[in-house]
Amino acid sequence: MGKRILVQRRGRGGSQFRSPSWKRDGPVRYLPLEATSGRGYVVELLHEPGLNAPVARIVTESGAEFFNYAAEGLYVGQVIEMGSGATPKAGNIMILGEIPEGTMIFNVEKRAGDGGKYARSSGTYAVVVGQKPEENKTIIRLPSGRVIEVDARGRATVGIVAGGGRIEKPFLKAGKKYHRARAKAWKYPTVRGKAMSPYAHPHGGGSHQKGGTPVPKTAPPGQKVGFIGSRCTGRGCVRARAQQKQ
């Protein structure tokens, strides 16, 4: 009797495949709109295992507490200005409609009050391109270069997310990569299907390794692995598609 392949077991969602949420300090998001005003204080800088950037724990004057990504140069004890009237200084949380053009920002809200959706990875930032006060819209350029409009009543943090250059440092050891993957419940290492036994994968088995064949789109679950209904595969296929576009 065959077994369910690994992707089916992952899809079912067993405990060994779930991200360890009990290790998290808390969600990185702004307080509700009515609570984000006045001043806050950076109490602690934390390493969050499930995130790619340092996290700052901020306590407001009213005693409310929340987590936000740390800006480059942020330090413990720094005073954070929040809400309307805040100055464009690194680490301050401002209303998008009040941020000057050309300012670098991160953790940008798509809609007012959603807690932050854009530019949240280490070393990234968005740039304020312009304002549309008559439409309550702010034009920003994302790290990808895409230009979008967001709600001008939303919030963003001034500066660049700390931890830039993270991907430039090599892992050096497979063990470090293992622990990074384990913190996020990633599948590591990735084993090729044709290197497995026949009971574990449709491409497995044989006296020597052979490449798998494309699978029809009508194949049942468990058999549908590898390339699904592909017209061609390999480097030549990519080259041919590039020539067609030209």
Curated annotation (Swiss-Prot):
InterPro entries: NA-bd_OB-fold (IPR012340), Rib_uL2_dom2 (IPR014722), Ribosomal_uL2 (IPR002171), Ribosomal_uL2_arc_euk (IPR023672), Ribosomal_uL2_C (IPR022669), Ribosomal_uL2_dom3 (IPR014726), Ribosomal_uL2_RNA-bd_dom (IPR022666), Translation_prot_SH3-like_sf (IPR008991). This is Large ribosomal subunit protein uL2. The keyword Electron transport does not apply. It comes from the Archaea. One of the primary rRNA binding proteins. Required for association of the 30S and 50S subunits to form the 70S ribosome, for tRNA binding and peptide bond formation. It has been suggested to have peptidyltransferase activity; this is somewhat controversial. Makes several contacts with the 16S rRNA in the 70S ribosome. The lineage of its organism: Archaea, Thermoproteota, Thermoprotei, Thermoproteales, Thermoproteaceae. Keywords: Ribonucleoprotein, Ribosomal protein, RNA-binding, rRNA-binding. Residues 196-226 are annotated as: Disordered.
